Amino acid sequence: MKQQGVTIWLTGLSGAGKTTITHALEQKLREAGYALEVLDGDIVRTNLTKGLGFSKEDRDTNIRRIGFVANLLTRNGVIVLVSAISPYRDIRDEVRGTIGNFVEVFVNAPLNVCEERDVKGLYKKARAGEIKSFTGIDDPYEPPLNPEIECRTDLETLEESVTKIWQKLEELGYLAKPVAI
């Protein structure tokens, strides 16, 4: 059976758990034999979108470029895991429309929880005024209105979040369901 491509787009505040969920889901998908690629927002910024700042226009350009690569992979039968803050609803919706096979995962944790998890000290720097236009502090995050999946990482375990995503992908027909014998 030929694998169907899909982009699984994890969005949420810095520290919400996007990368953690992405790595766990990646491992489970690889173990099951699926072809996939991961596009992590931090890694993409240092390679594909180097030189872009954090204005709305630059952030939109960043997300469009990630979406462009995700679309190329998706239409060639690859499962693409995108882990990116992608704070603006309009650009996420634009990318969804371009890709088609698109599953939005809202990785949701309250701001105070994200700040507690902040090992890099980014929130502290943003609150001190050392980082400008930091999402959730002095730049908005627009939560998805109708994501296919919401993972409440302050209330559920990593395993519960991954299982929730896996089950939705099966339900939508992107993953083959095991055959009962």
UniProtKB/Swiss-Prot annotation:
Pathway: Sulfur metabolism; hydrogen sulfide biosynthesis; sulfite from sulfate: step 2/3. Keywords: ATP-binding, Kinase, Nucleotide-binding, Phosphoprotein, Transferase. GO terms for biological process: hydrogen sulfide biosynthetic process; sulfate assimilation via adenylyl sulfate reduction; sulfate assimilation, phosphoadenylyl sulfate reduction by phosphoadenylyl-sulfate reductase (thioredoxin). The keyword Nucleotide-binding applies. ATP binds at G12, L13, S14, G15, A16, G17, K18, T19. The active site is at S86. Its EC number is 2.7.1.25. Pfam families: APS_kinase. It catalyses: adenosine 5'-phosphosulfate + ATP = 3'-phosphoadenylyl sulfate + ADP + H(+). This is Adenylyl-sulfate kinase. It comes from the Bacteria. InterPro entries: APS_kinase (IPR002891), P-loop_NTPase (IPR027417), Sulf_AdTrans/APS_kinase (IPR050512). Catalyzes the synthesis of activated sulfate. SUPFAM superfamilies: P-loop containing nucleoside triphosphate hydrolases (SSF52540). It comes from Rippkaea orientalis (strain PCC 8801 / RF-1). Belongs to the APS kinase family. One of its GO terms (cellular component) is cytoplasm. It is an enzyme of class 2 (transferase). One of its GO terms (molecular function) is sulfate adenylyltransferase (ATP) activity.
